[in-house]
Amino acid sequence: MARRLPKPTLQGRLEADFPDSPLLPKFQELNQNNLPNDVFREAQRSYLVFLTSQFCYEEYVQRTFGVPRRQRAIDKRQRASVAGAGAHAHLGGSSATPVQQAQAAASAGTGALASSAPSTAVAQSATPSVSSSISSLRAATSGATAAASAAAAVDTGSGGGGQPHDTAPRGARKKQ
């Protein structure tokens, strides 16, 4: 028959019961200010419940998806801006007008420049073939931005086969 371990004696205080808890620094940020003691104790209990549930949820998300959800969203946006800049570099002509292409390329170019700053350390530590492909991608992206701005400056009104831009106010058109 297995012996049961005695239950630990809890004092009801996080810092005394769990001194190595990762919630302790956040929990100690709660200040009493001018609250009565009983109200502050209730606020501490509620805050501890909130911190515990938040911590458990973050662990669950990290176990399920591999990285925290917020970081995934940031990475996804950076990849989309780089992919958008690359798509503009590879598209010779599209259904968008040259002015729209220039605006899209300029907005994608700023996103690509912002996201390329953290990747310089990666490019320096990467193998030569990877770093050369990264630099060629950057060159293609900057070339696309320059080509799109040049096309916008030389716009003759041909339109490139695109649909006309609707300038009517949002609710002005009849519903069909």
Swiss-Prot record:
This is Small capsomere-interacting protein. Residues 75-109, 148-176 are annotated as: Disordered. GO terms for cellular component: host cell nucleus; viral capsid. Keywords: Capsid protein, Host nucleus, Virion. Residues 80-109 have a biased composition (Low complexity). It is found in: Virion; Host nucleus. Participates in the assembly of the infectious particles by decorating the outer surface of the capsid shell and thus forming a layer between the capsid and the tegument. Complexes composed of the major capsid protein and small capsomere-interacting protein/SCP assemble together in the host cytoplasm and are translocated to the nucleus, where they accumulate and participate in capsid assembly. GO terms for biological process: viral process. It comes from the Viruses. The gene is SCP. Belongs to the herpesviridae small capsomere-interacting protein family. It comes from Epstein-Barr virus (strain B95-8). InterPro entries: Herpes_capsid. Interacts with the major capsid protein/MCP.
